[in-house]
Amino acid sequence: MLRALWLFWILVAITVLFSKRCSAQESLSCDASGVCDGRSRSFTSIPSGLTAAMKSLDLSFNKITYIGHGDLRACANLQVLILKSSRINTIEGDAFYSLGSLEHLDLSDNHLSSLSSSWFGPLSSLKYLNLMGNPYQTLGVTSLFPNLTNLQTLRIGNVETFSEIRRIDFAGLTSLNELEIKALSLRNYQSQSLKSIRDIHHLTLHLSESAFLLEIFADILSSVRYLELRDTNLARFQFSPLPVDEVSSPMKKLAFRGSVLTDESFNELLKLLRYILELSEVEFDDCTLNGLGDFNPSESDVVSELGKVETVTIRRLHIPQFYLFYDLSTVYSLLEKVKRITVENSKVFLVPCSFSQHLKSLEFLDLSENLMVEEYLKNSACKGAWPSLQTLVLSQNHLRSMQKTGEILLTLKNLTSLDISRNTFHPMPDSCQWPEKMRFLNLSSTGIRVVKTCIPQTLEVLDVSNNNLDSFSLFLPRLQELYISRNKLKTLPDASLFPVLLVMKIRENAVSTFSKDQLGSFPKLETLEAGDNHFVCSCELLSFTMETPALAQILVDWPDSYLCDSPPRLHGHRLQDARPSVLECHQAALVSGVCCALLLLILLVGALCHHFHGLWYLRMMWAWLQAKRKPKKAPCRDVCYDAFVSYSEQDSHWVENLMVQQLENSDPPFKLCLHKRDFVPGKWIIDNIIDSIEKSHKTVFVLSENFVRSEWCKYELDFSHFRLFDENNDAAILVLLEPIERKAIPQRFCKLRKIMNTKTYLEWPLDEGQQEVFWVNLRTAIKS
């Protein structure tokens, strides 16, 4: 029993593991181009079922601890393999043996405590290799990279354990586009370790201390074009002459990111510049300066050796005692030939006038995200300041008056571009003064509600994005580019305001439509961005977009950013795909069609009414309604006649001379109702007919050819027809005065025709011997 129980649990475990593996295999998704994504799928091993069709495989963020020699054998055409953060601690020596086409390999942030050169031997096509973030101390016993002749990007090292860089580490590498070394725990650097790489375009060094900086600098001086130092504490850096002969260093850019400096160490760093004669750009990002700016270069030749530095960039510089900071007079001469300076988000509130006057070559100055106000700006832009300045960026400072700002900058005679965006200005005045050469003005995110003539007429580029504008009516004759996105405009501005406009960006406004005429009114417009507006997909707009395939040449964000906001049935549809309904877009044609159809219907109904005696049925309905208002059966006291005689005027001789004489002079006599004698004068004929029939016990119809042609006889027959069949009253007596064709009786009297087929009627005999019998039968019928 116990054995069976163990066997059961083993089978359950195998089933669970197999189902998990199958589920994992199913979650590996590949597209038609061979790019497979297996990120964060809880794989515990390389998935099976890999094929030669795969070009890219990403298995990052899994739990793969081991890569065996056969796991990737099927991926002969694989070009990209990403195994980042997958807990890998063991890789077989020939695991990558079949990956001769591999160009990109990422093994970063795993648990590889040692590296093997056998992994990389077959990877002759490899261009990118990332080994960063693994807990190894060195790069292995032998050189890892002698066969990687095509390698362009290499990332190595870690934060805590990588402690030694040796000569053999980079043997075989002669040229790299990018080399990144994270060695924050570096304890030993073997001289000339990096010297074997003759050409490095961009070298990034993560060093916590500056102990080995001079040795490394000496090795890379002749090979690196862009050196980036990260997270380095340079507070204790001391310069000493480098053990190198005169060399022409190709280094163009030097960057410090996250570094710590002091006034003294800054002076020491300046001494390095004598070895970098071609240096043109220096950058400080997220650095800390523990000092007061008391820079005092001790060697006079430093000044001359800074001659080719044209760009200085400082971002987010933290100076704990910035309010005590010096005026930098000691470095004025160092920056005389600099053309571009950026000091961003560094609590700058003043550039001393004398410093500004020394920046004679400065063409570009960016003081974004600082503390500048008009009073201090006036001191900075004093007479003679920045004489060559063409572009000034004062974005996100504390400027308030547009008028004062313009007047202060009048001293900058060569200023052509001004960015004062993200300042909170007071309402725009009607007039302002600006430098006469100004061509570009950025007023985005300044909260302006109205654009006035304060804006200079000389502008070629104007940016008023992200404000509260609901209209734009300023004439700018030279304007070529207008950026007015994220406002409240409901339509495109009038084209006559910008006769030479080339580019307009009006995204995220309240524009509901635009037309062919509107776009055509801009004679030189080449680019329009009007997406993400509240478009009303009217017939005119949709018709225009469907009939103008060249829109994609002008609308750079067409078609994905152009969506219908209304009507509701088209909400969210692209203008390109939306189709208007016939009811909305062809109302005139639709109304015309409906009217024509209605007219045809009326004609058809009229023809049918004529053919099927519709008017007669209407008259019959009227008579029926009239009769319904009266009691269904007249009281006995209202029945005044034994019979109402309905006859044609042409048959009056027979009725008056024969029928009346025979019936009214009989014993007992019958009282007959004749229209000539008994109708009430002045009363409507139809009312007389109805009343006479209702007051008569019977109705005698004297049928003849004349009868069926008589109009009034038809009315009498109509109402009798109603009385006969609506009241189930057998009150009609048919007297056939002369033989008539049955088809002469109108089709509408279908029941009357049926009676003539099913019931006996009296026929006037021409034989005088039979006429007495006829009268006897008629009297009997009236009495019944």
From Swiss-Prot:
Modification(s) after translation: Ubiquitinated at Lys-754 by PPP1R11, leading to its degradation. Deubiquitinated by USP2. Glycosylation of Asn-442 is critical for secretion of the N-terminal ectodomain of TLR2.
The record's section on InterPro entries has: Cys-rich_flank_reg_C, Leu-rich_rpt, Leu-rich_rpt_typical-subtyp, LRR_dom_sf, TIR_dom, Toll-like_receptor, Toll_tir_struct_dom_sf
Does the keyword Coiled coil belong to this entry? no
The tissues in which it is expressed are: Detected in a macrophage cell line, smooth muscle, lung, spleen, thymus, brain and adipose tissue. Cell surface expression detected in lung alveolar macrophages, dendritic macrophages and at lower levels in lung macrophages (at protein level).
Biological process according to GO? cell surface pattern recognition receptor signaling pathway; cellular response to bacterial lipopeptide; cellular response to diacyl bacterial lipopeptide; cellular response to lipoteichoic acid; cellular response to peptidoglycan; cellular response to triacyl bacterial lipopeptide; defense response; defense response to Gram-positive bacterium
**Sugar-bearing residue positions:** 147, 414, 442
Q: Where is this motif: ATG16L1-binding motif?
A: 761-778
**How does this protein lie in the membrane?**
Single-pass type I membrane protein
Quick one: signal sequence residues?
Answer: 1-24
What is one Pfam family matched by this protein? LRR_8
Localization recorded for this chain is: Cell membrane; Cytoplasmic vesicle, Phagosome membrane; Membrane raft
Q: Where is the LRRCT domain?
A: 525-576
Topological domains, Extracellular: 25-587
Any GO MF annotation of the entry:
lipoteichoic acid binding
Highest taxon, organism lineage: Eukaryota
Has UniProt tagged this entry with the keyword Transmembrane?
Answer: yes
Present the record's domain note: Ester-bound lipid substrates are bound through a crevice formed between the LRR 11 and LRR 12.
Name the protein family: Belongs to the Toll-like receptor family.
**What's its job?**
Cooperates with LY96 to mediate the innate immune response to bacterial lipoproteins and other microbial cell wall components. Cooperates with TLR1 or TLR6 to mediate the innate immune response to bacterial lipoproteins or lipopeptides. Acts via MYD88 and TRAF6, leading to NF-kappa-B activation, cytokine secretion and the inflammatory response. May also promote apoptosis in response to lipoproteins. (Microbial infection) Mediates activation of bone marrow-derived dendritic cells and macrophages, and production of pro-inflammatory cytokines, such as IL12 (IL12B/IL12A), triggered by Toxoplasma gondii micronemal protein 4 (MIC4) and micronemal protein 1 (MIC1).
Subunit arrangement?
Interacts with LY96, TLR1 and TLR6 (via extracellular domain). TLR2 seems to exist in heterodimers with either TLR1 or TLR6 before stimulation by the ligand. The heterodimers form bigger oligomers in response to their corresponding ligands as well as further heterotypic associations with other receptors such as CD14 and/or CD36. Binds MYD88 (via TIR domain). Interacts with TICAM1. Interacts with CNPY3. Interacts with ATG16L1. Interacts with non-modified M.tuberculosis protein MPT83. Interacts with PPP1R11. Interacts with TIRAP.
Its name, as the record gives it, is Toll-like receptor 2
Q: Which organism is this protein's natural source? A: Mus musculus (Mouse)
Q: What is the lineage of its organism?
A: Eukaryota, Metazoa, Chordata, Craniata, Vertebrata
